[in-house]
Amino acid sequence: MARVKRGVTKHQRHKKVLKLAKGFRGAKSKLYRPANEQVMKSLAYAYAHRRDKKGDFRKLWIARINAAARLNGLSYSRMMNGLKIAGVSVNRKMLADLAINDAAAFTELVNVAKAQVSAK
């Protein structure tokens, strides 16, 4: 059986890892082993944080909706309950966008929610 020395294969793998490690500080962008360790950790962080991002944006939208709703005299939870009772199916992303860019439309939605909550 022939001896396999891995010269080209190893070089290509090292080059691929060092390319991914571009921009890292110190040895983590120059030497294969620390670069490989950091690249693996970075990819793990990227994977986890792509999932965290969904919750982070939801929290941001809720904070924005709550702030705008309180300016109109209603808490976030009461507003969402009122909109649900009224059958208004506007998601949090759209509500947060309305709160920032179209205050008049948001105020109308708050009034709809207020009417439903007070009628209950």
Swiss-Prot record:
GO terms for biological process: ribosomal large subunit assembly; translation. It comes from the Bacteria. InterPro entries: Ribosomal_bL20 (IPR005813), RIBOSOMAL_L20_CS (IPR049946), Ribosomal_protein_bL20_C (IPR035566). GO terms for cellular component: ribonucleoprotein complex; ribosome. The keyword DNA damage does not apply. Keywords: Ribonucleoprotein, Ribosomal protein, RNA-binding, rRNA-binding. Disulfide bonds: none annotated. One of its GO terms (molecular function) is rRNA binding. HAMAP family: Ribosomal_bL20. Belongs to the bacterial ribosomal protein bL20 family. Binds directly to 23S ribosomal RNA and is necessary for the in vitro assembly process of the 50S ribosomal subunit. It is not involved in the protein synthesizing functions of that subunit. This is Large ribosomal subunit protein bL20. It comes from Desulfitobacterium hafniense (strain Y51). The gene is rplT.
